[in-house]
Amino acid sequence: DSHRMSISKFRLHEKINFDPVILPKKTIFQLCSLLEEYDGDVKISNLKSKIKFELNNSILISKLIDGKFPNYVQVIPKNNQKKLEVDLKLFLDSVDRVASVSLDKKDGVKFNLAKDVLNLSVNNTNSGDGKESLNVKFEHDLDISFNSRYLIDVASQLDGEKIEIFFNDTGSPALIKDPSDFDSIYVVMPMKG
């Protein structure tokens, strides 16, 4: 969607010619489900307006979305020099706890950052307030808010022990990385106000 993006690369054993395609979100979820317990090769065939994935005893065929994919590279932040580093599990659990105060997971989690401290807060007039403080590595002062569901979704995808979030300013997208994974990055837009 226009508020978040993930980019993952993986290396192929051999170079192949394959025109870029756009897959429906439902197809991606179905493919991920098939791949969860699978560790073999996947044969991918581009059939004009359809794509076919063959793995073991399963075949998934899907229509493709017409059109050309937007230039996502221009959306990746390039000047985010303010680096936050924190334990992944602590971060994920804290965001989840603070967000649980709100009835609506779309409510913003406010980050109040100072030197080596991240204060997380949610304020919902109907269900109350939630606050937590984490010790982090950070060298700046910054106040910024994010949709809690987006943060939880991204953090849940990471496998390492740490999460790194790179900021520019309050209104610019954040770049999120797992320092142990050089092939994936995540971009999340902050909430306004």
Q: For the regions a protein language model found, what residue spans apply to each?
A:
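Specificity-determining recognition surfaces
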Residues: 71-72
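Short hinge/gating elements
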Residues: 75-78
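DNA polymerase processivity clamps
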Residues: 1-7, 14-65, 80-193
